[in-house]
Amino acid sequence: MEAVTAAWERYAAGRTPRRTHNAAGATTWLNWTQYADHGPDESVIGEIHGRRVLELGCGTGCNLAHLSTLGAQCVGIDIAPTQREKAAARWGHLPGLSFRTAEATEFLAAHPDSFDVVLSIFGPVWFIDPTTLLPLVRQSLTAGGAFVFSHKPPRPDPQPGEPLREARAVSRWDHSPCKWAALLESARFANITTEIIDPPHGEREGTLVVRAEAREERIGRPARQS
Ligand SMILES: C[S@@+](CC[C@H](N)C(=O)[O-])C[C@H]1O[C@@H](n2cnc3c(N)ncnc32)[C@H](O)[C@@H]1O
């Protein structure tokens, strides 16, 4: 785990802060994609006001800050301590918003049934084995709660003659929309939707956005025997 934390600390050190205003002049906004001023807004999530929202791998907290301005009670966690410091310095004045340094699986395991919405925007859902992570996300959500995440769609295998991919410091679960739907179904999610958002003009890679809801489960009583 120390090597993973160190890799994400290096990542944090190389990032430039998000702009103070977007193209529309807003000071907070939610961005699901890897491109500025592109893609759907927070309406993908569903209801926000009054909801308890957890973001896994919130980085500098800019997406979560936006949800906080819309009336959500927000907790952002990130494995890299520097990210929490930057998030708190920029957004710590907003009400109903807090940031913690925590590893996603450890945090989820300690907070069952606590959130109405769990988000991961290019976050840990991409970097943790889903057979470990999805049951923990499901357990942390209230029945009917929304789980929404985004990451790059899987790339086709390299063609003969194409350069091999670079080695990565952290593993990545580049699943297709169908594979995510199957994994979510078996982890007790329902109403699963997947969409690949087209890239902006001149770019090649789109963005996969997945939404699912924690299945409401009836615990049936055993039938009475006569
Ligand atoms: C690609 S960045 C995305 C940050 C942010 N969501 C955004 O859209 O700008 C991934 C973030 O996930 C965090 N992260 C990666 N693995 C994690 C884990 N296992 N637990 C918690 N945070 C993690 C990293 O430190 C990093 O800040």
Where would I find each of the regions flagged by the language model?
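A short SAM/SAH-binding and catalytic strip from SAM-dependent methyltransferases
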Residues: 117-131
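Class I SAM-dependent methyltransferase SAM/SAH-binding core
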Residues: 54, 60-106
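A short glycine-rich, Lys/Arg-flanked "PGG" loop and its adjoining helix->strand segment in the class I
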Residues: 131-146
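A short acidic, Gly/Pro-enriched loop at the edge of an enzyme's catalytic core
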Residues: 109-118
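Conserved S-adenosyl-L-methionine
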Residues: 189-200
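Core SAM-dependent methyltransferase catalytic element
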Residues: 198-226
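Conserved class I S-adenosyl-L-methionine
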Residues: 1-49, 62, 146-177
